Amino acid sequence: MIHAVRSCASCGETSCAMHRPGIALDRPAERVAWLLDDAWPETASMVGALFEPNDQLLVPGIIRGAPARYGWPLRAWALAAVSQTVGRHWAMRRVAKAPGGIRQRTYLHHDRLIARALARAIDFRARHLVVAQSWLPWLDEAGALGGRTFDVVMSRYPFAEIHRLLEEAAAELGSSATIADFRAEATLVDRESELLARARRIVTPHHGIASLFPGRAQMLAWHRPPPRNPAAGNRIAFLGPTIARQRPDIARKLTAGMDEPLIAFGPILESLWDDVEIERRALGPGWLDGIGAILHPATMTHQPRHLLEAVANGVPIYATSTCGLAPDDYMPIGRFRARERAAPLVTSATAS
C-alpha cells in the first residue's frame, strides 16, 4: 500500500525528525548522494524536505516511476541500475514460491548487483552518503564508503538482531519448517554490524530498530492512512500469514476459551492451527470490519502497514515490542493475557 507523500509544512507531526527541517541529518556542506531503494512514504517525505539542488539521488528502476515502489517525489534522480533492476524483479518472481532461504539468498545476490551499479554512478564530489540498508555491505565492498561519512536508512532489523530473535523464537517453538530456513553468512552479518557502528546516523520510522541505536537514531514519523470507519465489532483477529515467526502459537493460547473463533488473516504457510477453530479472512478493503482487537505476537515486523491502518481506525493492537509502532500505539501482549483471564471475551468497549 503506497500513500501520498505529505508536506512537512502541513502534516502536523511534531515528534518527527522532520519537524525542524535541516536538523535531522545535520548535513555537511558538501554535496550529498542519496542511494535509496523502495520509496517508503516516510523516507520520501524526508527526501522531499532535505534534498538540495546540488544533491544526487540514485535509485533502482526500469523507467521513471516504474515499478511504483521506486516512485520518488523528485525529478532530479537518476536510474543507475536498469538492467540490474530488471534482473532483480525477474528473480523475485521466479522464486516467489520457493522456500524462504532460497528467496533471501536470491534477494541478497541481486541487491549486491544493484548496489555495485549505483556505486559506479556516485559523483566524486559527494563527501556524504545517505544509503539504503539493502546496499550498505555492497557499497563497502565496492569501496564507495571509503573517505566518506554516511547515514543509513534502515528498513529491517540488522542481520545479527534478526538471527537473535529467530533463535529465541526457535528455542520456544521447538521444531518448525521455517523458523531456521535462512541465516545470513557470518561474514555478511559481521560486515553489516561493523558498518552500522560506523554510520553517523541511523534513519528509520521503526521504533524497535531505532532502540538499538541510542543517541544516533533519527526517527521519522510513520504515515498513517486516512481512517475508513470500519463496522464496529468485538472479534479478535490474528494478523498473518500463519508461519512460525508470526507466533500463532501465542495467539492460540491467548484466545483459548473464546466464545467465537479467532479470525486469521493471510495465507496459511504452516499447519499451525490443527485442532483449533479459526475463521479465515483475506486482507482487502473492509478487512477491519467487525474487528475489536488485533493480536500481533510476531517475532518481528519490519513494515507494519496493516497495523498502522488499525491504529488510524482506532482498533486496539496487542503486540510485541518488535512491531515497529510507537509505544503509545499498541499494548503489550501481556495486557491481553491479563484481560483475557478476567473476561472470556474482549469487546470493542472494554478494549478501548
Segments (PLM) and residue ranges:
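Conserved catalytic-core segment of nucleotide-activated headgroup transferases in glycan assembly
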Residues: 46, 222-285
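Acceptor-binding helix/loop patch of EC 2.4 sugar-transfer enzymes
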Residues: 93-101, 152-187
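Membrane-proximal helix-turn-helix segments that form the acceptor-binding/catalytic region
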Residues: 113-121, 158, 171-201, 289
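Short alpha-helical segment that forms part of, or immediately flanks, the ligand-binding pocket
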Residues: 285-286, 304-312, 323-326
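Aromatic "clamp/platform" in nucleotide-sugar-dependent glycosyltransferases that forms part
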Residues: 299
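Short hydrophobic beta-strand element within catalytic cores of glycosyltransferases
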Residues: 316-320
